[in-house]
């Protein structure tokens, strides 16, 4: 666009210079008695008459104003306003021929005066005969003043060739008037072209503005996929929480891939289901058992001691097993109480101790836990499939130890999911 505008401006400058240099004007002045009448012919444009006379009506009809723009070597450049013939403003023109005003100031209008230039060397011998032929053709195109016919008969026989060139400018005047009307439409479209170019520029600007916002949302959409891979550290946060809660690792890893893949377009819902849904199933069953063990174990051990003491005092008809059970009961509360005290001392590491004890001394902890559970409620043994002994409430811990020593009933008492959880925990640790 800039190159095109530069080319257009350069072309206009060239055309303006060419028009100024090549426009030729024929100036016909009657310089006798101070040059009252000046007949000026603009080449191919307009023909107007400047009258510095008392006849104001003629002056108002033909021309109104002139403004001097630039002085050249031979003349001046004018901007011409015509009321009758040239309604639009004509371009600047150059006075190539000097004004024959004898070096005096010629008043073009009531407020503008132009000093006459020097005469050309070719036209210097002809200032005296020039007024004589000029009035002779002047009556034909336009009315001439009364003093003009008086000098015409005196020099008419001498300059016989002069009338021959004199009609030529008169004919040029008539010809110039006829094409003067034709260029008027040529001047009128020039403002229309300028008006058409301006809306085209405004219309070209509007689509460029609409295209730029269409490009701006594309970078706004691109950072959205870049933010989705940043959600990958969410699994890195889950293993940091899993070592604190050892059993909760296995269920937390299994449901996490399903919600993480589904809410990839949305950022917030992908994080919320992993934190809310996974801990609830894992923490409730696991936290309930160590709490029941820690709270019920001291009470269960005391109840076992009281029940065993009352049973030993009341039952004198039992065999040697009852006496051995009394001795074993005195020994059994100590590990159960120590285990319960060790678990109640550190509540924060309850899950870790329960898993470690169940990993290495499985029969001992299972015996204590099964003892406490059997003394509290007989239902777990019925559910596990083992037949209940004849006196479940008064059963001693020695019988349970004997069952665990066989190795057959110890594996039945442990649920399968606990073994799977312990094995997975050991697998992830090592």
From Swiss-Prot:
GO terms for cellular component: extracellular region. Residues 124-168 have a biased composition (Pro residues). Residues 1-19 form the signal peptide. The keyword GTP-binding does not apply. Residues 286-303 have a biased composition (Polar residues). Keywords: Glycoprotein, Secreted, Signal. It is found in: Secreted. Residues 316-325 have a biased composition (Basic and acidic residues). Residues 169-253, 263-285, 326-370 have a biased composition (Low complexity). This is Putative uncharacterized protein DDB_G0290521. It comes from Dictyostelium discoideum. The lineage of its organism: Eukaryota, Amoebozoa, Evosea, Eumycetozoa, Dictyostelia.
